[in-house]
């Protein structure tokens, strides 16, 4: 059966500490609980968690929903969105199964990017690479949290931007 890869690209910078991080953790848990009630999602959805602050790190590689458990999110300094995007693109390249003449690949991945700040690294190259090579391969939904979220930077990546 074809998989539906869902990547969560989560800002875990110091500004997310406290209530924002708690809400993020609870939101992940509620989403997973909701998806687990859908038999089709149980068979097709694979989840991955990538956390970023100054650097990006995969906390959970793509794993089937039935065995997924939301990891504890670490806190770091900086909001390295450029590094996070590069890491995400590498994960898409290595973990998403492509369609070949012999078999159907994965469904188009969905990426949920959540951040509450302004990038602290240069995002220009990563944004260009995303737009050129990945924008058609994956559906990205960006969520800006709070009054300091850089919505302009998020709009460079996707037209699907939500501000909370």
Name the predicted role of every residue range.
Residues 1-60, 67-107, 110-114, 141-153:
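Von Willebrand factor
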Residues 4, 33, 101-103, 124-125:
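P-loop NTP-binding core
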Residues 43-72, 151-157:
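Short beta-strand-loop
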């Amino acid at each position: 059966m074809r998989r539906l890869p869902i990547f969560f690209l989560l800002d875990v910078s110091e500004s997310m500490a406290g209530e924002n991080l708690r809400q993020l953790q609870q939101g992940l848990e509620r989403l997973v609980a909701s998806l687990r009630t859908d038999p089709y999602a149980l068979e097709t959805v694979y989840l991955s968690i990538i956390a970023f602050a100054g650097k990006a790190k995969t906390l959970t590689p793509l794993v089937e929903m039935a065995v997924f458990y939301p990891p504890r999110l670490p806190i770091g300094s900086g909001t390295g969105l450029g590094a996070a995007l590069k890491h995400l693109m590498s994960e898409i390249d290595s973990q998403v199964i492509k369609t070949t003449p012999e078999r159907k690949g994965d469904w188009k991945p969905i990426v949920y990017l959540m951040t509450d700040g302004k990038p602290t690294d240069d995002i220009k190259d990563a944004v260009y690479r995303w737009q050129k090579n990945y924008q058609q391969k994956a559906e990205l939904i960006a969520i800006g949290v709070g009054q300091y979220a850089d919505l302009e930077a998020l709009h460079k990546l996707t037209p699907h931007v939500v501000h909370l």
